[in-house]
Design a protein with these regions (language model features):
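Parallel beta-helix/beta-solenoid
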Residues: 40, 64-66, 74, 83, ...
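Leucine-rich solenoid repeat scaffolds
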Residues: 152-197, 427-476
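Bacterial N-terminal signal peptides
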Residues: 7-15
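Right-handed parallel beta-helix/beta-spiral solenoid domain characteristic of secreted/periplasmic
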Residues: 27-28, 49, 54-55, 64-110, ...
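Short glycine/acidic-rich loop motifs that flank beta-strands on beta-rich extracellular proteins
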Residues: 56-58, 74, 81-86, 90, ...
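N-terminal extracellular ligand-recognition/capping segment immediately after the signal peptide
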Residues: 27-36, 41-68, 74-84, 104, ...
Length: 476
């Protein structure tokens, strides 16, 4: 009998011990910032109605303890973060957010603590003027996040690896903030149910054999799947319109991702795929592909984006018959190998084609026109560059960094500063190229070009080679 009484007393006391202290927070009383400084793991912060802005709180509001932030019964608290700051920075594991209205101008929730739970929350971009680089929830290297019945407006979720650190060197990275993510569980361990993006379903699939995403989805996240098929989707006005990682094969056709804060269509760590007829307008990075292989972008377009079509750490892939207009960086390729650009166009960009430290690239039948900085920039990137048209650019082609080039049968027309700028390009060959209507110079040669050959090129202005080293053979 004594043992039974002891057990009853223990069970009665245990819930009291397990439940932490409850802090009442309100705009007229204690702030969240103050309560979070006082609380401990297991405590609860109940938020009264009203607006919690920079006049009351210190942003970002850092949550470094396993606490619950929830709306008080019948109340509708609004967390209104200023520009350039996250509303909430979740550092602790096991944080819960319930019934909150989070409005932001850069990031709603910056989450680097695992086991985050959000239920019944509203997350919205407060002002579309701050769309570029904005994100509803940045998930940086976290596991087992649970989202239920949350509504996103003008934003969505972005999934990534952990924040950059010294150990990130040599790994694929994302936007200078996070690693792409070397553990598939950063993407596949979550639970997302009953959520919407711009009033449309947020579609999440993980570790499935075959997935066909619905056309009416507001955001599409498919990770760790064997086959992903997406047709005629419109995921505009999200943070990341699509997140496709660790899939064996993806097919995306006739889909669009306009006005997205981070990426329109994002694929990483995929083993093969085709994006056909996809587009992005006024998106930060239009179509962004990283750390993948055997990817083809065909008949895709990007307009008025910060960056148009993006390859990073991509192998044995191609962009074919794509068009980019009015972007900062039209096509960006870096740190990949075995890639091809075929019949692609960059019109009225800053840099039309920007290739940085790529393995050997084939670029054929492409057009760069009206680019205000450079039509084609080859930074330490060996290339076979043939049959391309460079028209009305400030500099048509700039090549430097010691990589070998073969440039043949290209048209350089109307270059306002220089048609072809070469610096330290050894063992390269230039044949059958035509220069017309050059502004200041047709060709400028600087530095070492040992072993390079110049043969049967038609210049409208004399080649400027006063600063070139020895070993540049001019053959007629």
């Amino acid at each position: 009998m004594k043992k039974i009484l002891l057990w009853v007393m223990f069970l009665l006391l245990f819930p009291l011990a397990a439940c932490g202290e409850v802090y009442s927070v309100s705009p007229q009383g204690m702030s969240m910032t103050q309560a979070l400084a006082l609380c401990r793991d297991g405590d609860v912060l109940e938020l009264g109605g009203g607006t919690y802005d920079e006049n009351l709180e210190s942003f970002p509001i850092v949550i470094d303890k396993a606490v619950v932030l929830r709306a008080a019964e019948g109340q509708s608290p609004v967390i209104d973060a200023p520009a350039f700051k996250a509303a909430l920075r979740v550092e602790a594991d096991g944080v819960a957010l319930e019934g909150l209205d989070i409005r932001f101008r850069r990031t709603g929730v910056y989450a680097i603590g695992s086991d985050l739970r959000m239920e019944g929350c509203r997350v919205s971009l407060a002002d579309p003027a701050w769309r570029t680089s904005s994100c509803g929830i940045w998930c940086g290297g976290i596991y087992r996040m649970t989202l239920r019945d949350c509504a996103f407006s003008g934003c969505s979720i972005a999934l990534a690896g952990p924040p950059l650190s010294e150990s990130s060197k040599g790994k694929p990275v994302l936007t200078g903030l996070f690693e792409v993510g070397e553990d598939p569980a950063y993407f596949t361990s979550h639970t997302i149910e009953g959520c919407t993006v711009n009033g449309k379903p947020l579609f999440y699939a993980a570790c499935q054999a075959r997935v066909e995403a619905p056309e009416n989805a507001g955001q599409i996240i498919c990770c760790g799947c064997d086959e992903v098929i997406i047709r005629s989707a419109d995921v505009s006005d999200a943070s990341m319109g699509m997140v496709l990682t660790y899939n064996r094969s993806i097919l995306i056709e006739n889909s669009r991702a306009d006005r997205c804060g981070v990426f329109g269509i994002y694929a990483a760590k995929c083993e093969g795929g085709l994006l056909n007829g996809c587009s992005a307008v006024q998106t930060n990075h239009g179509l962004d592909i990283r750390a993948s292989r055997h990817m083809i972008l065909q008949n895709c377009t990007a307009a008025d984006c910060d960056q148009g079509l993006f390859f990073s750490f991509i192998k044995d892939s191609a962009m074919i018959a794509c068009t980019v207009t009015g972007t900062g960086q039209g096509y960006f390729l870096a740190a990949g190998s075995g890639n091809t650009l075929k019949n692609c166009a960059a019109i009225n960009c800053e840099n039309g084609f920007n290739l940085q430290k790529e393995g050997h690239v084939l670029m054929h039948g492409c057009t760069a026109q009206g680019c205000t900085v450079c039509g084609v920039r080859l930074d330490a990137t060996p290339a076979a560059f043939a049959g391309n048209t460079l028209r009305d650019n400030w500099v048509a082609v700039m090549a430097y960094g010691g990589a070998q080039l073969d440039l043949a049968d290209n048209l350089f027309e109307g270059s306002r500063c220089c048609g072809l700028y070469l610096r330290d390009i050894a063992y390269s060959r230039f044949s059958g190229n035509t220069f017309a209507g050059s502004g200041q110079a047709s060709v400028q040669v600087i530095g070492t070009l040992d072993g390079s050959v110049w043969l049967n090129n038609a210049l409208d202005k004399p080649l400027e080679a006063a600063q070139a080293g020895e070993g540049f053979s001019l053959l007629r």
